[in-house]
């Protein structure tokens, strides 16, 4: 949860039951900033939304009280974290981890937002960027490639929090 270590590398070796999601865009992608977004059920009755808006961490994380604006104590006990955020241009990598004991009943949704082209709803720059998402879970690695469609928001997959079944969405839209 330390914001000063956002540029460090994250290992793909993780504990059983833990899921790591890694977003990557390359040097020649034409993109400067792509943001990871994960929503899911929190410890309370609502949903969390993990992402990094304008340099301020916005998520429910138990050890980051000072930057979790409006979070209740029970929401802060959700240990899902944005481990690495990259906002300094290409190439870039962002990492989200869901520890084994943090899974809640309900649907999780992972998306990537082309922040570079956020003002263009009909852009195809994201679709030709070569951006990938890799998911590591229980000794398996799954790779998702950005679809060839216009838009600046890529909804990659959903996860059932009870069964941990990942369902591919792979859809583009605009925000």
Where are these regions (language model features)?
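Intrinsic-disorder/low-complexity signal
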Residues: 14-175
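Elongated, non-catalytic scaffold/linker segments and compositionally distinctive motifs
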Residues: 1-17
